[in-house]
Amino acid sequence: MLLGRPLSLADLEEIARRGRPVAICAEARERAAASRRAIDAIAAAGDAAPAVYGINTGFGALAETRIADHDIRALQRNLVRSHACGVGPELGEAEVRAMIVLRAQVIALGHSGVRTEVLDLLAALLERRVSPRIPAQGSVGASGDLAPLAHLALTLIGEGEARFEGQLLPSAVALAKAGLAPIELAAKEGLALINGTQYMTALGALALRDAAALCTVADIAGAVSLEALMGSKRPFDERLMRVRPHPGQAGTAGNLRALLGGSEIMQSHADCPRVQDAYSLRCMPQVHGATRDAVAWAAEVLTREVNSVTDNPTVFLGDGADGGAELISGGNFHGQPVALALDLAAMAAAELANISERRVEQLVNPALSTGLTPFLAPHSGLHSGFMIAQVASASLVSENKVLCHPASVDSIPSSAGREDHVSMGSISARKLAQVIENVRSSLAIELITAAQGVDQRLPLRPSAGVAAAHAAIRRVVPGLTEDRPLYRDIAAAAELIQSGALIAAVEEAVGPLN
């Protein structure tokens, strides 16, 4: 994968989660070197140079403080040290790797004025799997994700801590064990490394990749539930989708038609007197589809951000009146576009769990389940079956409702009022990641519950798609013949979802799904 060229969210996921190798493209090296020459020209002028933010001035509310030439390098080092104020749990390796990729991508676009040596060290961290220790909390999302990115930059200068080969080590030790050496920051480089949206974008991009997959998982889970509840596939008729042409709705309906074709269960009740199913079954295209569309829009926003320059000041070559370089101070570090997109994505993803939990209620409630045993227990009363599995899903759904409060509507002024509006996008990203985890668990509960319902419909066979999903579930979760702790089953089903094995098994039976 070449940094400095357009990256997709799928590309980012491949590098962050699956270790796909990266390299810096030749054009990126040329761009970075050219922008660095502009910074070197300012630094070479020494105290005679004009005041340029972040090169020979202080930061934030101290931007009017002029820094002497002999302190230029110390200024950058002090910036990184002072801004490393993160708190809370440590980020996982995939999230840290995504941050490294995105920070390198910004530099590779050639508007940051950072030396290629820094770019190479970032790429080497990925190659050697050196993972800086980055606390998850401490950013307000403008001027970018300062605190988490400062922890990343600490490792580059041999300070802070990093993980290497499973051990948490002083960064200098981790670098040495990996055959790397720390760098000394030159003019502007500390600022260029910490000023940007790479924390919120990294977490958000990975969460959106998960959200997109969960849209398909929700369709699969809903199809299994529909078979267990002896529901109808008629509401998914393509003609209905054509007269309300939302793409996500059409995508979900197409999945459901593919998943439900050729079902003995469905054929057995084709002439039943029931006119309509509950909304949680009948309206899956409209609800799941709306989530698909919202997640797709958020992914478009994040894809633009992945390939954007969020540095400040920004170096432009050949734009000055004399044909030379020009540095422009602006606000590209502000995370509002990302924050709004991730807040919407959290609300959209939460709906997958909202409607899933209602289907679980249909499955366990004998008044709604069309002949299934109460709580799907083998001997209801002596055994409680899936009674508390539904309660667990309800808990996750309610937690998501709290997490869906938008962080992006909040702002707290900082830096003595100079930074008087912030995005809180880092909180949006962390909330989305937790919502996604909760949705995955909710869908896992639906899958194991619905699979039990399908068992009770034997000897009638479900559709090929539902049979494939059922078989995949049964490979990791046996049927319930008597009460047992279900937490291991829920975790196993959640892993089946997260690994992609469920979707793969179903697609093998019915072909590619949306």
From Swiss-Prot:
Q: What is its EC number?
A: 4.3.1.3
- PROSITE patterns for the chain: PAL_HISTIDASE
Location in the cell reads: Cytoplasm
Q: Which Pfam families match?
A: Lyase_aromatic
Highest taxon of the lineage: Bacteria
The top EC class, named as a word, is lyase
Post-translational modification comment from the UniProt entry: Contains an active site 4-methylidene-imidazol-5-one (MIO), which is formed autocatalytically by cyclization and dehydration of residues Ala-Ser-Gly.
**Record keywords, A-Z:** Cytoplasm, Histidine metabolism, Lyase
Cross-link 5-imidazolinone (Ala-Gly) residue location(s): 142-144
What catalytic reaction does the record list? L-histidine = trans-urocanate + NH4(+)
Please give the biological process terms from Gene Ontology that the record holds. Answer: L-histidine catabolic process to glutamate and formamide; L-histidine catabolic process to glutamate and formate
Name the GO cellular-component terms.
cytoplasm
- GO molecular function list: histidine ammonia-lyase activity
Main subcellular location: cytoplasm
2,3-didehydroalanine (Ser) PTM positions read: 143
Pathway field = Amino-acid degradation; L-histidine degradation into L-glutamate; N-formimidoyl-L-glutamate from L-histidine: step 1/3
What the entry lists under PANTHER family is as follows: HISTIDINE AMMONIA-LYASE (PTHR10362)
**Protein name, please?**
Histidine ammonia-lyase
- What's the source species for this entry? Sorangium cellulosum (strain So ce56)
